[in-house]
Regions:
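Short, compositionally biased leader-like segments
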Residues: 1-9
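Active-site- and interface-proximal helix/loop "cap" or "latch" segments in soluble metabolic
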Residues: 11-101
Length: 101
């Protein structure tokens, strides 16, 4: 199998529904052998949140498109987990880079 599954984690605010259900925010990525994001899912409460997150990430390069993806999140994702998505993404990149060594 040439694909990798990587999960990044982040904390969310105490009053966030995700924290009440999961204690943390998780984003799982399936990455192909060329670094393309094939699929992504987050520990979001609403289905529409995951649908929106998928539109942001799928088809992008996991490493090279970090700045573009982060910018899109900051401009267009106005939910309470905005920063948590970016932190979880950074955590997933760290794990991805460690697995390459």
């Amino acid at each position: 199998m040439k694909e990798k599954y990587i999960v990044g984690t982040a904390k969310t605010s105490i009053d966030n529904a995700i924290t009440k259900n999961y204690n943390s925010f998780f984003v799982g990525f399936i990455i192909d052998e060329n670094g393309r994001i094939l699929d992504v899912e987050a520990s979001a409460i609403l289905k529409i949140t995951n649908d929106f997150i998928k539109k942001i990430f799928i088809g992008k390069d996991f490493i090279k498109d970090f700045d573009e993806i982060s910018s899109i999140i900051l401009k267009n994702y106005l939910g309470s987990s905005q920063k948590s998505i970016i932190v979880a993404y950074k955590d997933a990149i760290k794990k991805y880079n460690q697995s390459a060594n």
